[in-house]
């Protein structure tokens, strides 16, 4: 049985200037800043955009770009088994409290997707 996708969790955007991006997304777009972003070792911010989130990440080097969208899932282990059965390459990130369990995969065009099982 195929694992379930619960919905879009967040869209992650690489930006050169986090404060400038925050002004746009908060002042112009009406998003609200979240206070629960873990320390990932690089500048960024998490925003609420209705029931979904926008994650801003400071990466000036396009080669290190982490732009992606994240699908919320209920069972990350089932997705790993699903990918293994289909020989789909993926990367499972170490668990970061507050960030949920994460698996990254690329579509055939090279777009990065994150599957995210939130901490509850």
Question: What is the predicted function of each stretch?
Answer:
Residues 1-4, 85-120:
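Vicinal oxygen chelate
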Residues 12-52:
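Core segments of cupin and vicinal oxygen chelate
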